[in-house]
């Protein structure tokens, strides 16, 4: 049996970080070796005890690069591929991803908010370093299926709008998942929603954000929600609606573990779970 995959989790004490740590601890082929979080007063505490799992003998640290450096050195003379799973904040995810690649640690990025320019920069940087990684807007297999169905339907409908709904602590809008869905639809058709009336918004933004293709994207933020997305197509006499609901974050864990297991064999960054399944 091969050695377990060393895994560092950034955003370890957050809701997604906690789910990831629980999944990693219970996966026989993974080993939690680092827990990064900047929550005040938690430095040096055992992450397992903080999350109510069990004592894991992995201390919480706020030193991101120090943790990556230590993990990188620990696997330098082995055939192991260390992995960083990042669920932090859009403001730091670019720097985190670039640092992981620089240290030879394979990034698995669940934090959304990277711009196309940043994503392109990271892809080129990872290719030069021959360090594989993955930026995954949504780890749900069900969402991948919705996106594929939306791309297929786009061939037949000229009118479509996308709505994503998340908890009110999500920092970015629209979600990376919603943007990715729109991008897949735009690969099939370059222009949507031909104008049939001269629209006027009495409240700016009422029609959502409009992409260059004409697709309208709407974002809702409310307590009680987890992650939900709807794509509605319209044509004379009918509508066609696709919807996916995540009701518990455990739905993401099969996709997270799949990505952890596959990034070590990649030679550059990939975007989207569909690239791995």
Swiss-Prot record:
GO molecular function, one term: 4-hydroxy-tetrahydrodipicolinate reductase
Chief location of this protein within or outside the cell: cytoplasm
Enzyme class per UniProt: oxidoreductase
Pfam families for the chain: DapB_C, DapB_N
Subcellular localization: Cytoplasm
Pathway participation: Amino-acid biosynthesis; L-lysine biosynthesis via DAP pathway; (S)-tetrahydrodipicolinate from L-aspartate: step 4/4
Keywords: Amino-acid biosynthesis, Cytoplasm, Diaminopimelate biosynthesis, Lysine biosynthesis, NAD, NADP, Oxidoreductase
Coiled coil regions, renumbered to chain: none
HAMAP family: DapB
Protein name according to UniProt: 4-hydroxy-tetrahydrodipicolinate reductase
Organism of this sequence: Synechococcus sp. (strain CC9902)
Protein's gene: dapB
């Amino acid at each position: 049996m091969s050695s377990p995959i060393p895994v560092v989790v950034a955003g370890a004490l957050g809701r997604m970080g906690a789910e990831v740590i629980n999944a990693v601890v219970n996966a026989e082929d993974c080993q939690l070796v680092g827990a990064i979080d900047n929550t005040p007063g938690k430095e040096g505490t055992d992450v397992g005890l903080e999350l109510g799992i069990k004592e894991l003998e992995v201390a919480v640290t706020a030193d991101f690069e120090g943790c990556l450096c230590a993990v990188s050195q620990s696997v330098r003379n082995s055939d192991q591929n260390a992995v960083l799973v990042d669920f932090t904040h859009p403001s730091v995810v670019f720097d985190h991803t670039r640092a992981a690649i620089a240290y030879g640690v394979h990034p698995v990025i669940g934090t959304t908010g990277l711009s196309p320019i940043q994503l392109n920069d990271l892809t080129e940087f990872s290719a030069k370093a021959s360090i594989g990684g993955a930026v995954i807007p949504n780890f749900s297999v069900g969402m991948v299926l919705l996106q594929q169905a939306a791309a297929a339907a786009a061939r037949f409908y000229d009118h479509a709008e996308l709505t994503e709904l998340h908890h009110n602590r999500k920092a970015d809008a629209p979600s990376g998942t919603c943007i990715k869905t729109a991008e897949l639809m735009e690969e099939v058709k370059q222009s949507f929603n031909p104008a049939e009336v001269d629209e006027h918004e009495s409240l700016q933004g009422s029609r959502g954000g409009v992409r260059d293709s004409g697709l309208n994207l709407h974002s809702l933020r409310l307590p009680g929600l987890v992650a939900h997305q709807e794509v509605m197509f319209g044509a004379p006499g009918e509508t066609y609606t696709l919807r996916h609901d995540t009701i518990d974050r455990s739905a993401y864990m099969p996709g997270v573990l799949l990505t952890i297991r596959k990034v070590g064999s990649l030679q550059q960054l990939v975007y989207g779970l569909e690239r791995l399944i």
